[in-house]
């Protein structure tokens, strides 16, 4: 079926927090919960993304809209290993941009400077350590800044 999805150009988006919160609610024991393992579908050419659309509402009564957190939650629940972490970050950045046909996506001269700077060294670290956003830019203008945590000796 995965090859058919890829061949038809069908993209798949998973909402990890909502899926986990809503699944199994109809049972009184053996609450089966999970998410579609879309990181495995990437290998067959399916464009997959991770997102959240239900925050602080009846479908998901918690959350902070962090897509890095969704990538981390997905990696945990779908048993994605360290070699998949980069793909998990892609599924909240470049892959949704492709799904939305954002041709001007990416960091290159002449493209809109819309980006978030994370406190990490690698894409894998962003997902595994829930990297904190330090700066955000929209159209080349800083839209927010956040100081990095400083640890002091006791």
Show which residues each predicted segment covers:
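His/Asp/Glu-enriched, well-ordered alpha-helical/loop segment
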Residues: 14-23, 33-118
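Acidic, amphipathic alpha-helical patches
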Residues: 1-2, 106
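Acidic (Asp/Glu)-rich catalytic clusters
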Residues: 2-9
């Amino acid at each position: 079926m995965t090859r058919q999805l890829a061949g038809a150009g069908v993209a798949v988006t998973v909402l990890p927090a909502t899926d986990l919160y809503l699944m199994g609610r109809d049972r009184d024991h053996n609450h089966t919960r999970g998410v579609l393992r879309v990181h495995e579908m990437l290998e067959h050419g399916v464009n997959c993304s991770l997102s959240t659309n239900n925050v602080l509402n009846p479908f998901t009564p918690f959350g902070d809209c962090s897509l890095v957190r969704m990538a981390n939650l997905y990696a945990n629940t779908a048993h994605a290993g360290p070699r998949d972490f980069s793909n998990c970050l892609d599924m909240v950045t470049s892959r949704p941009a492709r799904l939305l046909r954002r041709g001007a996506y990416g960091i290159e001269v002449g493209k809109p400077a819309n980006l978030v700077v994370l406190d990490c060294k690698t894409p894998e670290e962003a997902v595994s350590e829930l990297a904190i956003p330090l700066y955000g830019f929209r159209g080349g203008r800083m839209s927010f800044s956040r100081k990095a945590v400083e640890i002091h000796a006791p």
